[in-house]
Amino acid sequence: MNNAPHLYFAWQQLVEKSQLMLRLATEEQWDELITSEMAYVNAVQEIAHLTEEVAPSTTMQEQLRPMLRLILDNESKVKQLLQIRMDELAKLVGQSSVQKSVLSAYGDQGGFVLAPQDNLF
């Protein structure tokens, strides 16, 4: 069975999904990125299934190589953008924790307002 056209089409679809994920990450559309990830994973599994059935010829491998490079480059860029986002979120969580600690320590002073006073001596 010659699945070369189907395999090539599956790789083209994977490239499109990869480019979509990169665009979503670049535009900081994180919810949409997460949603699109499942379609990407399914496309990768489809390609794995197709290549298990029949190994691609050397010619087909040469045709697919640029697509694979593009996909790997896109994936690397998406990972970098995700790491930046994770760092931003960690910073926000840290700030939130500090604010919570400050409020917890100083927020409840038994109804008294703490204010500097003049020295009475």
UniProtKB/Swiss-Prot annotation:
Q: Where is this region: FliD binding?
A: 60-98
Q: Which key words are in the record?
A: Bacterial flagellum biogenesis, Chaperone, Cytoplasm, Repressor, Transcription, Transcription regulation
Main subcellular localisation: cytoplasm
Q: Where is this region: Required for homodimerization?
A: 1-50
The keyword Amino-acid biosynthesis is annotated on this UniProt entry? no
Any single biological process term in GO = protein folding
Q: Name one GO cellular component term.
A: cytosol
Q: List the disulfide bonds.
A: none
Q: Where in the cell is it found?
A: Cytoplasm, Cytosol
The UniProt family comment states:
Belongs to the FliT family.
**How does this chain assemble?**
Homodimer. Interacts with FliD and FlhC.
Q: What does this protein do?
A: Dual-function protein that regulates the transcription of class 2 flagellar operons and that also acts as an export chaperone for the filament-capping protein FliD. As a transcriptional regulator, acts as an anti-FlhDC factor; it directly binds FlhC, thus inhibiting the binding of the FlhC/FlhD complex to class 2 promoters, resulting in decreased expression of class 2 flagellar operons. As a chaperone, effects FliD transition to the membrane by preventing its premature polymerization, and by directing it to the export apparatus.
Name it: Flagellar protein FliT
- Organism expressing this protein natively: Escherichia coli (strain 55989 / EAEC)
